[in-house]
């Protein structure tokens, strides 16, 4: 599934871009299920967050996003790869990003196929946002 920015995330991202003097950082989270699928009306409480041993929420520092680049009409920013190394088992369906302070959902994406993690695995996620 493609990345989806729900209505709540659209409002928050526009505020961050255009009116927030000091926008809050974001958090990257993994999920095991989402109630009703990812839709325009999704909110953060629809997601069941991962709980495997070794899991942690990844704080996304605003200054760490790579410089924007444009290719074939799409301008993209990426965030350096984030990894998790579980020491217990859990199936991960995708990731979602929340605003750091209020925890509001900004965007979410399901993986092409779920990932059944076991001890010794590494799960890597590289965020990429594009506008065209």
Where are the regions that the model predicts?
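Small cysteine-rich, disulfide-bonded extracellular modules of the LU/uPAR three-finger superfamily
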Residues: 1-94, 99-132
């Amino acid at each position: 599934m493609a990345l989806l920015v729900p209505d709540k995330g659209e409002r928050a991202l526009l505020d961050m871009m255009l009116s927030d003097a000091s926008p809050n950082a974001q958090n990257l989270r993994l999920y095991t299920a989402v109630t009703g699928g990812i839709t325009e009306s999704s909110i953060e409480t629809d997601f069941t967050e991962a709980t495997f041993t070794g899991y942690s929420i990844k704080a996304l520092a605003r200054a760490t996003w790579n410089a924007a680049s444009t290719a074939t009409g799409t301008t993209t920013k990426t965030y350096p790869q984030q990894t998790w190394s579980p020491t217990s088992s859990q199936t991960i369906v995708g990731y979602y990003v929340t605003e750091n302070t209020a925890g509001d959902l900004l965007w979410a994406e399901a993986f092409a196929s779920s990932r059944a993690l076991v001890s010794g695995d590494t799960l890597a996620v590289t965020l990429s946002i594009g506008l065209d």
